[in-house]
Amino acid sequence: MKKLAKRITGKEWGMILLTVLFTCFSVYLELEVPTYISEITELIGTPGTDMGALWSPAIKMIGLSLLAFLSSVTVGFFAARVAASYTTHLRSDIFHRVLDFSQTEIKRFSIPSLLTRTTNDITQIQMLFTMGLQVVTRGPIMAIWAIGKILGKSEYWLWAVVIAVIVNVLMTTVLMTLAFPKQSVIQKLTDKLNSITRESLTGIRVVRAYNAEDYQDQKFEEANAEVTRLNLFVNRLMAIMNPIMMAISSGLSLAIYWIGAYIINDASLTDRLPLFSDMVVFMSYAMQVVIGFLLMGALFIVLPRTLVSAGRINQVLDLHSSIENPSQPQTADSSIQGQVEFRDVTFRYSKNSEAVVEHVSFKAEAGQTVAFIGSTGSGKSTLVNLLPRFYDVSDGEILVDGVNVQDYDLEDLRNKVGYIPQKAVLFSGDVKGNLDFGKSPETPLSETAMWQALELAQSKSFIEDKEAGLNSEVPQGGTNFSGGQRQRLAIARALARKPEILIFDDSFSALDYKTDRILRQVLAEKTQSMTKLIVAQRISTIMDADLILVLDQGKVVGQGTHKELLATNEVYQEIAYSQLSKEELEHGK
């Protein structure tokens, strides 16, 4: 919590100070009320008291109560403002930190866990602020102030209050000790539950196709039952708190009246009325002490989970991306554009893991096409993901326009690259928003530029067929488009940026052969100045590449043109002849 407290802004500290001041004022007013109760009690017990004499203390008491009410409302207002303001920028900080994470950091937490930390854990912090500013300040202030008021009244009554406070503190300590370890487990199980739910929903068609509803239900029920069991354990512990506190409160009242009865019985007749008045006042103050601890007890119900949430949030905020901008970024010579060179590149996901790609070297001049082919898991996608620095190389270096990619400002480097991932990603909004996405030297795009990009990507026809055209709605994930249409829109988005380098990470896989062939022909004609790196499974997609790298278990086992590899490389031959006939391969059909 100390780390999170450092993120509170000056304005929020100001509102917190006002909250404390109004809380003190409210407590002061509430603690003044028993004084007038005592005065009214004495007046009632005094023979011959006129009814008019009661109005003055009664009106003052009502006035104090109204002021205390207004002060409490003000405290609630400021507490809500602070909680909302703080969690707004805390949520924003987490979101921006996650956006800066490389794939390594995202895999470390997992997407469901990051979602839980950004939503549920933040809500726990907001609840703590809302309750805490009203309870944490009010409880101790009221308890201490009330104890100060009753000091010197009667040591017997005072001992009753002290014993009640000690029992209260012991109970709270025991409950916190039992509940706190369970809260950490609950949060982890909540992550697991979210992961299972997300997995089931995203793969719902596969689940239904394999009649696996019962299997997924069982997985969910097991995780859900475990979360429920622990939540019940914690909630039952917390449920004990209120009855025990009520018992302490009732016991304290009984003790005060019992002790008071003995004291008043032993006093002279003239002293009995003042003693009774003192007992009424003491009783009011004692109840204020108990209420103070009741308020703090209410906070302890949410505190264990909030502390766990704070730790989980700090884990995200304390972790910095392994992909960092250089302190003194370099710029490339403007005379060189689109040149890519890999020099003995090796990559491992961690220092102790096996290399995913090893000793890869090649050079692509501006406008050339370099293709990568190999079996599943051979490292093709990982290799091209190193260029825009989604990961950093473990050994060797990658040069773009003669400059090491790690020496570029990240924004400048990624402005040079148009990236089309394996799974086409479309964002909710409209077609126009998906094409004019992010920052690049070309933004904001004109509609003419968008239509040109759509035409290049063979997407113009099906967008024109839509009534709203570029303003056509795109739901999350682009579910109103087919897989091939989504891929073509993703290609159009990259082309619209007019980058120096295009990376196609198996981006033709959902296209039919005819569209694939037409698209490749158009790209070859219209993007001659752009360097193209193509990861593909189909031989037909890469036959015309200037250079083809054959990968097997992360190593380059062949390098050359289609004809050269077809004549000399066994791995390439095996892939090629499994897809096309000898005539198609030799004549490039």
Q: What are these regions, as identified by a protein language model?
A:
Residues 10, 14-74, 78, 151-156, ...:
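Transmembrane helix-loop-helix hairpins at lipid-water interfaces of multipass membrane proteins
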Residues 10-13, 100-104, 120-129, 133, ...:
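An intracellular "coupling" helix at the cytosolic face of ABC transporter transmembrane type-1 domains
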Residues 11, 15-28, 32, 130-186, ...:
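Transmembrane helices of ABC transporter permease
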Residues 21-22, 29-42, 64-111, 115, ...:
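Juxtamembrane helix-loop junctions of ABC transporter transmembrane domains
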Residues 50, 149-166, 233-312, 316-317:
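Helix-loop-helix
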Residues 98, 220, 313, 342-344:
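Conserved catalytic Walker-motif region of ABC-type ATPase nucleotide-binding domains
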Residues 333-589:
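ABC-type nucleotide-binding domain
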